[in-house]
Regions:
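Solvent-exposed loop/turn segments flanking beta-strands in beta-repeat/beta-sandwich domains
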Residues: 80-109
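Signal that preferentially marks extracellular ectodomain short beta-strand elements
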Residues: 121-135
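Short, compositionally biased P/S/T/A/G/V-rich stretches that sit at domain boundaries
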Residues: 20-81, 166-167
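Solvent-exposed serine/threonine-rich low-complexity stretches and specific carbohydrate-binding patches
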Residues: 104-120, 160-161
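Exposed beta-strand face motif in extracellular beta-rich ectodomains
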Residues: 137-143
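Sec-dependent N-terminal signal peptides
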Residues: 4-13
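Extracellular fibronectin type III
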Residues: 151-165
């Protein structure tokens, strides 16, 4: 019996395992309405403009579900913020919401998020379980991207189309 346990233990310790883990491609945005001070622009309450959103890259899963990392889909986006706005890009977050309210693969978080900021651009990437190409749903949906400040004021949306490449 003790040899059985020893051999079983050795087998489990020597089994090759693959794991997949992505660091989030975004950070939480902390709203603080009770500590927020409204900013003025030429004597008028400053509004949040529509961000300029660019789809940098869409990567589809290439392996069967359960494969390590290769079944993940990724969407890389950039949001450019106007330098002329009274709110700095460090003071705002962004909501990503499917235009019809239904995110087909739960790609985007339900809360406002911040991206990795460089100059006046925030970079994001979103990961979802995409699976083998044989079983993938076609990507073709619209996403509204809203800026939000710490007082939970929401700006005008930019609408982008997430669509898989043709051919």
């Amino acid at each position: 019996m003790k040899y059985f346990l020893l051999i079983t233990s050795i087998l489990f310790m020597s089994m090759k395992t693959n794991a997949c883990s992505f660091a989030p491609g975004y950070f939480g945005f902390d709203a603080a309405p009770d500590q927020f001070e409204i900013k003025m622009d030429k004597g008028i309450i400053a509004l949040l403009p529509e961000p300029k959103v660019t789809i940098d890259k869409i990567i589809r899963g290439s392996a069967s579900v359960g494969s390590s990392c290769e079944d993940a889909g990724m969407i890389h986006l950039s949001t450019e913020w106007p330098e002329s706005n009274v709110y700095n890009i460090n003071e705002i977050g962004f909501y990503f919401q499917s235009e019809n309210g239904v995110d087909p693969d739960l790609i985007f978080p339900l809360i406002p998020v911040k991206g990795k900021i460089k100059n006046n651009t925030a970079k994001f990437f979103f990961v979802w379980l995409d699976g083998h190409p044989k079983y993938q749903k076609k990507l073709d949906f619209k996403v509204n991207v809203f800026a939000v400040n710490k007082g939970l004021q929401i700006g005008m949306p930019a609408t982008i189309t997430i669509k898989e490449n043709e051919g």
